[in-house]
Amino acid sequence: MKKFILTLFTTLLVCLGTLTVAQADDYLRIGMEAAYAPFNWTQDDDSNGAVKIEGTNQYANGYDVQIAKKIAQEMGKEPLVVKTSWNGLIPALTSGKIDMIIAGMSPTAERKKEIAFSD
């Protein structure tokens, strides 16, 4: 009986883990500070095409956000901004917390060692 319950519990965890991954695939998580107007900023509503900031009741907007929306649309995903400090952007990308950085980051030689940049 204990083996059956353990097997059932393990199967349930695997299924729930798969469900979480499937839900995450619906979103393109974009890392940015949301504090560098006019490129990206934080606002309290979704006016003028703003995008929800993950884990908050706020929204992000600006040039970077509008570009992110176009990229997400082309990929068939919903854009979701993950507000991240400047120094946390690369670690967030390399750890998989975000899918891309859209924040006016220059492609320095040091940064190119860790992440890829678009042309």
Model-derived regions: residue spans:
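Extracytoplasmic small-molecule ligand-binding "clamshell" domains
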Residues: 25-104
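Ligand-binding "clamshell"
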Residues: 97-98, 109-119
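Short amphipathic alpha-helical "recognition" segments used for binding
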Residues: 6-7, 37
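Bacterial N-terminal signal peptides
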Residues: 7-18
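Positively charged n-region of N-terminal signal peptides that target proteins for export
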Residues: 1-4
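Short, flexible, glycine/charge-rich loop motifs used to bind or transfer phosphoryl groups or to couple energy/partner
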Residues: 20, 91, 117-118
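Sec/Tat signal peptide C-region and signal peptidase I cleavage site
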Residues: 18-24
